[in-house]
Design a protein with these regions (language model features):
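Phosphate-binding beta-alpha-beta segment of Rossmann-like dinucleotide-binding domains, i.e.
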Residues: 94-144, 156-159
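An N-terminal-biased, well-structured beta-alpha scaffold segment characteristic
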Residues: 1-93, 191, 211
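Rossmann-like adenosine-cofactor binding region
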Residues: 54-56, 173-264
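Conserved beta-strand positions in the Rossmann-like core of class I SAM-dependent methyltransferases
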Residues: 169
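Short, conserved active-site loop motifs that form the nucleotide-linked donor/cofactor pocket
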Residues: 29, 88, 180, 270-271
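Glycine-rich Rossmann-fold phosphate-binding loop(s) that bind the pyrophosphate
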Residues: 150-151
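Phosphate-coordination loops involved in phosphoryl transfer and adenosine-cofactor binding
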Residues: 8, 65, 141-144, 221
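C-terminal helix-to-coil terminal segments
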Residues: 2-8, 84, 91-104, 131-136, ...
Length: 310
């Protein structure tokens, strides 16, 4: 794909986008992939999703780049500091996926406490038919659920869990104007929790925030749920804690090196594994795509973004 004076290429796709998003971009902007772009001059917007990288190399390849539009609320795949240094603005897709991710977070809490997927495996294995007994599980009502990161999604998840009768505690950068119990560190929150739910954004500041100390504080009866970013949890420490019985189990929708999941986790019945589907509903993904298009249009027309990052 080349650009000319009549039909300049102003938008490029960096990868990781769903087919319908690629089609929408192609229809509206004739947006090719970076690999198919023979002349990068004049490209003002790069759209990226699915964890595809938008770093210095990609920015070097697009000398006129002015904006990186990310399909997703998390943007640790984008080198925001490098973009800022070059005067490139970055957007994400907040708010529109809040409900879907909060729903999944709440469902995973219910699952790890009530053993829903474990019970499904129990039936399918023939254990029930053989007269074996499924172990007793835990009530959601009265359980202390610690929400690590009380942003939009964390708040929505906490509200759902409170409706189940759970007791909500939380940690964030500072106390919020809420009735829930605040803790001043992840370790303190984990120590008070039956289930620790990770909902903090990714990025350098949260890399391996949930480490061995946090997991030890959670304790042998505690469960970890992560629907944020795989980078937030020290995966090696998590595997070790599970193998040593230092925590009771986990529910994970995200991993450090997706789509690769550690073999040690695949082999465990006390872990619920999902393929990063927190926002994977038709309605949510379409809303995210519309917000991506709104950001692209706003930047090309006015030099501004609808949902800029930081």
């Amino acid at each position: 794909v080349t650009s000319d004076t009549q039909h300049p290429v102003r938008v490029v796709q960096l990868g990781g986008l769903m087919p319908f998003v690629r089609e929408w971009l192609a229809e509206r902007y004739a947006a090719p992939s970076l690999a198919d772009l023979s002349d990068p001059s004049g490209v003002r917007v790069a759209v990226v999703g699915g964890g595809a990288r938008a770093g210095a190399a990609e920015m070097d390849a697009l000398p006129d780049l002015g904006a990186i539009v990310n399909f997703g609320v998390g943007y640790d795949n984008v080198d925001v500091e490098e973009a800022r240094r070059r005067g490139i603005v970055v957007s994400n897709t907040p708010d529109v996926l809040t409900d879907a991710v909060a729903d999944l977070a709440a469902f995973l809490v219910v699952d790890v406490l009530r053993g829903i997927t474990a019970a499904d495996r129990f039936v399918r294995s023939g254990a029930w038919a053989r007269g074996e007994r499924m172990p007793l599980t835990r009530d959601v009502r009265g359980a202390v659920v610690g929400v690590l990161g009380l942003g939009r999604i964390g708040t929505a998840a906490a509200e759902r869990l409170e409706a189940f009768g759970a007791v909500v505690h939380y940690h964030s950068r500072s106390p919020k104007d809420v009735a829930w119990t605040y803790h001043d560190s992840p370790v303190a929150l984990a120590r008070a929790s039956d289930v620790l739910v990770v909902l903090t954004p990714g990025g350098a500041g949260t890399d391996k925030l949930v480490d061995a100390d946090v997991l030890d504080a959670l304790g042998p009866e505690g469960h970890l749920v992560n629907v944020a970013r795989g980078s937030v949890v020290d995966e090696d420490a998590l595997v070790a804690a599970l193998e040593d019985g230092r925590i009771a189990g986990a529910g994970l929708d995200v991993f450090a090196d997706e789509p690769h999941v550690p073999e040690a986790l695949l082999a465990r019945d006390d872990v619920v594994l999902l393929p990063h589907v927190g926002s994977a509903t038709v309605e949510t993904r379409e809303a995210m795509a519309r917000l991506v298009l709104d950001n692209v249009a706003a930047f090309l027309e006015r030099g501004e973004l609808v949902t800029p990052v930081g």
